[in-house]
């Protein structure tokens, strides 16, 4: 579709409400104002006016706001009509506007896309709009707002600028090889490169925090039947989310709870007890359990402390450990400490965290909560933090790889041309975050996930 079209969409959620807003952007927005309002409102002033139908009768009355381009969110002429929030009223007004030639319904995210294309915000800021709307916690909302205000983009742009200066220095060394000073081996380039690598590592650390805050961590509770998995889910969720009985195999399907631990979002998943089941329904539940385990960020290996004294997961259930995906983090949870009399707390066994608790009484559950938070490196207070998406992490990782490759070329062979190329590729990877180098397909995927009126 052409970006020269004038677009309209409801900017408020569907349904009944006190206020309903229609947003219009494009060349014909001025004509819409004159047709529907009978006048062009004073720029950036609220004007209380009737909204008129084709025959001049009033459809509604409310506030009209006129933002002539380029001083608007999209960079185009923008008109906002704020009327009553009834779906019938808004639908009538929308149909009235669509009778005007050259006006069409906006695609999802098209207002933000136009703002990006008109240099009103970069791609990371545009994504932050959707993240702010979807934020599931106060900290996520604050971090999304920081990204919208340019905190993440500023960090990325600083890295791009540093790489630009470094590339200039390297290119000079390549173009003037007969100078008395060997720029490639005088130590200055290596020092600057190490500085950029260190700055990039710091941004990657914050970005991982931001991604965790946005995406959440997927934690799967797994183990044999009657180990207390559902009781632990209830204890972590703070409510009776799962049915708990003494009957083995009570949980046959996957149960999900979304919780927060000091601002960190977690997707807690309770699964069917793992065993050789004869019942077809239970077998399906066990298959689903393994599917969830294979996609987990961490597994809580639930152990009934009354059935074994072993603490090493390989000794407790070697077949289970052997089937787990390689490098999948495990926390061993020895349950029923209220019965065994074990000392509550946390220790480490063969590189795995071991938590002793009672899911029934709740004793020791806070220790597990802290373990989950610390295991992901999550910081409760992230002043100035920003949200990040998986594509951001990938771009940062690619940039880091190019810088390490460039450093190897510099130290191994003093190969200036190869170093310059790696620096260029690193710069390009970083620029993908803000949208300076981004394919149209990626833009389409990003903005299509937005709300219609954003």
UniProtKB/Swiss-Prot annotation:
Primary residence: cytoplasm
Keywords: Cytoplasm, GTP-binding, Hydrolase, Magnesium, Metal-binding, Nucleotide-binding, Potassium, tRNA processing
One example GO MF annotation: metal ion binding
GO cellular component term, pick one: cytosol
Family annotation (InterPro entries): G_TrmE (IPR031168), GTP-bd (IPR006073), GTP-bd_TrmE_N (IPR018948), GTPase_MnmE (IPR004520), MnmE_dom2 (IPR027368), MnmE_helical (IPR025867), P-loop_NTPase (IPR027417), Small_GTP-bd (IPR005225)
Domain of life: Bacteria
Cofactors: K(+)
Residues annotated for K(+) binding in this entry: 226, 245, 247, 250
Protein family per UniProt: Belongs to the TRAFAC class TrmE-Era-EngA-EngB-Septin-like GTPase superfamily. TrmE GTPase family.
Oligomer status and interactors: Homodimer. Heterotetramer of two MnmE and two MnmG subunits.
Protein name: tRNA modification GTPase MnmE
Name of the encoding gene: mnmE
């Amino acid at each position: 579709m052409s970006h020269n079209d004038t677009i309209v969409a409801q900017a408020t959620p569907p349904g009944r409400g006190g206020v309903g807003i229609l947003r219009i952007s494009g060349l014909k927005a001025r004509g819409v104002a004159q047709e529907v309002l009978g006048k062009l409102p004073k720029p950036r002033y609220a004007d209380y006016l009737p909204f008129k139908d084709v025959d001049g009768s009033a459809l509604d009355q409310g506030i009209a706001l006129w933002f002539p381009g380029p001083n608007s969110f999209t960079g185009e002429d923008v008109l906002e009509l704020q009327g009553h929030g009834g779906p019938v009223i808004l639908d009538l007004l929308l149909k009235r506007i669509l009778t005007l030639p050259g006006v069409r319904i906006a695609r999802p995210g098209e207002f933000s896309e136009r703002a990006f294309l008109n240099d009103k915000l970069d791609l990371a800021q545009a994504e932050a709009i959707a993240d702010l709307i979807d934020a599931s916690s106060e900290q996520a909302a604050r971090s999304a707002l920081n990204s919208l205000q340019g905190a993440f983009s500023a960090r990325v742009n600083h890295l791009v600028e540093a790489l630009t200066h470094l590339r200039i220095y390297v290119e000079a060394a390549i173009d003037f090889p007969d100078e008395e000073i060997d720029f490639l081996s005088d130590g200055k380039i290596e020092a600057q490169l190490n500085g950029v690598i260190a700055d990039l590592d710091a941004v990657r650390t914050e970005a991982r925090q931001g991604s965790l805050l946005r995406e959440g961590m997927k934690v799967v509770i797994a183990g044999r039947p009657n180990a207390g998995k559902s009781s632990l889910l209830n204890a972590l969720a703070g409510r009776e989310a799962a049915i708990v009985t003494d009957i083995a195999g009570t949980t046959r399907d996957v149960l999900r709870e979304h919780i927060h631990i000091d601002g960190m979002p977690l997707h807690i998943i309770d699964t069917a007890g793992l065993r050789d089941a004869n019942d077809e329904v239970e077998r399906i539940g066990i298959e689903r359990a393994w599917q969830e385990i294979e996609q987990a960020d961490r597994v809580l290996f639930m152990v009934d402390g009354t059935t074994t004294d072993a603490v090493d997961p390989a000794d407790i259930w070697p077949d289970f450990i052997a089937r787990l995906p390689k490098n999948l983090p495990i926390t061993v949870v020895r349950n029923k400490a209220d019965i065994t009399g074990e000392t509550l707390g946390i220790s480490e066994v063969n590189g795995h965290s071991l938590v002793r608790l009672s899911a029934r009484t709740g004793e020791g559950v806070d220790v597990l909560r802290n373990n989950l938070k610390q295991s992901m490196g999550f910081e409760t207070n992230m002043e100035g933090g920003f949200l990040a998406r998986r594509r951001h992490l990938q771009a940062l990782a690619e940039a880091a790889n190019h810088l390490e490759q460039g450093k190897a070329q510099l130290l191994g062979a003093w190969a200036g041309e190869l170093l310059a190329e790696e620096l260029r590729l690193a710069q390009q990877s970083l620029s993908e975050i803000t949208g300076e180098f981004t394919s149209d397909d990626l833009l389409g995927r990003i903005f299509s996930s937005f709300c219609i009126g954003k």
